[in-house]
Amino acid sequence: MGLSRKEQVFLALLGASGVSGLTALILLLVEATSVLLPTDIKFGIVFDAGSSHTSLFLYQWLANKENGTGVVSQALACQVEGPGISSYTSNAAQAGESLQGCLEEALVLIPEAQHRKTPTFLGATAGMRLLSRKNSSQARDIFAAVTQVLGRSPVDFWGAELLAGQAEGAFGWITVNYGLGTLVKYSFTGEWIQPPEEMLVGALDMGGASTQITFVPGGPILDKSTQADFRLYGSDYSVYTHSYLCFGRDQMLSRLLVGLVQSRPAALLRHPCYLSGYQTTLALGPLYESPCVHATPPLSLPQNLTVEGTGNPGACVSAIRELFNFSSCQGQEDCAFDGVYQPPLRGQFYAFSNFYYTFHFLNLTSRQPLSTVNATIWEFCQRPWKLVEASYPGQDRWLRDYCASGLYILTLLHEGYGFSEETWPSLEFRKQAGGVDIGWTLGYMLNLTGMIPADAPAQWRAESYGVWVAKVVFMVLALVAVVGAALVQLFWLQD
Ligand SMILES: *[C@@H]1O[C@H](CO)[C@@H](O)[C@H](O)[C@H]1NC(C)=O
Ligand SMILES: *[C@@H]1O[C@H](CO)[C@@H](O)[C@H](O)[C@H]1NC(C)=O
Ligand SMILES: *[C@@H]1O[C@H](CO)[C@@H](O)[C@H](O)[C@H]1NC(C)=O
Ligand SMILES: *[C@@H]1O[C@H](CO)[C@@H](O)[C@H](O)[C@H]1NC(C)=O
Ligand SMILES: *[C@@H]1O[C@H](CO)[C@@H](O)[C@H](O)[C@H]1NC(C)=O
Ligand SMILES: *[C@@H]1O[C@H](CO)[C@@H](O)[C@H](O)[C@H]1NC(C)=O
Ligand SMILES: *[C@@H]1O[C@H](CO)[C@@H](O)[C@H](O)[C@H]1NC(C)=O
């Protein structure tokens, strides 16, 4: 046996083309990598001081691609141990100390020479908004404590501030659209282009104490107090945004409990949103301390109530509806609930934070229709507590609340914001967009550091990731073509 001389030559050619093609590919990769990874990476840190906890986000980008051409990525997301800073009313200093652990974790990832050049921000949201209403001197003490700790850490600390609900909504919207590349995009032809406005997505955020809805409506925004304007990459955007204080998940759960206690005061509270067979003791005092609760505990009640789950989704939905004032919108056009103006919904929406966490647990993040979502949550609410508890042994402190928060989200989106069976498919439940966690923090940092310029960049023609990918793809195609041609030739001869 043996190959003919012709076949040997062809095999040799084939091998050679394969090897040289591969070499070219490797060279291209090495060259491109050295272009894409210059030594100077910049960093930025944002603390998201929410009502239930604080998170640290570390972002990084290339120093030579500032002013809009850079792509910011997330290098670290760290959950601060302990509760939100607004809980440290009796020991403000500890609120500052609690941030140390995550900060140290972030500093490990940043070269020491750059520590002092790393812009660091702390933004507080609805938890502190509520506290400063209730007792502004306590809120001031807490801000002073976190400012002191971050001010003496080896970073470039820009300050701690209370974010208004509108800013929280707007920055969440910027984060989503920046992550998705719907504000500006690098095209295959090597130009920066502006995607059509229909590509912009709305943002639905739900924290512990407040919830935000932000989108670009199709028509004018009639209530100017709900309008936020900004200029990004040379385009003007007018978004509708509203933040509902006391409609975050945790405050909603407290208000729900109080509503049930008030409507039927008794030492044994039967809770329709807790699964049947669930039982616990509830201390009444702390429940009524929330600034979102405007009632006093019935005098006839003991300090501690026994709470029993009944797993009744119908009764649960009725109790949840009591948290909304739908009648205040009756007869008014473009009104959501509690008398709040809302223009007609438009386009795609990303629902994140507690929207995502709740629906992720319930396996409802894969674009199920509204009827399936409803049926799934109702089915979950009717499961016996014993079975559910056994499936998730001690791993989830929110386990008893998923029925309530699932039905709450459904009520808010469907009856509150007005998503119907037809518009429900425009909702995506997501945690991330373009590799970054969705929240207000990235949009906030981009804005404060001026990394999204108001004007369109003049010369945006640097090597981009998209072009690099295209090059690789074309090289691979070329390689495949060469090999294919050689193979055809080879088999053709053997015929
Ligand atoms: C970005 O813009 C600022 C001022 O707008 C300028 O000082 C800086 O040099 C610019 N950076 C780059 C890399 O072009
Ligand atoms: C606010 O808190 C401080 C200290 O905890 C307390 O002395 C003060 O009475 C509180 N003020 C109000 C209005 O509750
Ligand atoms: C209420 O419950 C707490 C523990 O949850 C307990 O420390 C307290 O003594 C109880 N109070 C009364 C009046 O039973
Ligand atoms: C609902 O809003 C209307 C109009 O703002 C008000 O008159 C009514 O008292 C509210 N209902 C409740 C239950 O708060
Ligand atoms: C979600 O799906 C997983 C895997 O299919 C399953 O184990 C889990 O029980 C489901 N969760 C709920 C709440 O039904
Ligand atoms: C959810 O399902 C229940 C029971 O099947 C039904 O009564 C209710 O109207 C449904 N809700 C929605 C929003 O479809
Ligand atoms: C971004 O920051 C500038 C000041 O640097 C401010 O005027 C502007 O309103 C901010 N944008 C948004 C959306 O808040």
Curated annotation (Swiss-Prot):
Membrane topology recorded in Swiss-Prot or TrEMBL: Multi-pass membrane protein
Keyword annotations of the record: ATP-binding, Calcium, Cell membrane, Disulfide bond, Glycoprotein, Hydrolase, Magnesium, Membrane, Metal-binding, Nucleotide-binding, Transmembrane, Transmembrane helix
Cytoplasmic topology ranges: 1-8, 493-495
Domain statement: The transmembranous domains are involved in regulation of enzyme activity.
Organism: Homo sapiens (Human)
Record-listed E.C. numbers: 3.6.1.5
GO BP of this protein: nucleoside diphosphate biosynthetic process; nucleoside diphosphate catabolic process; nucleoside monophosphate biosynthetic process
UniProt-annotated location(s): Cell membrane
Gene designation: ENTPD8
Main localization category: membrane
Protein name as catalogued: Ectonucleoside triphosphate diphosphohydrolase 8
Cofactor needs: Ca(2+); Mg(2+)
GO (cellular component) term, any one: plasma membrane
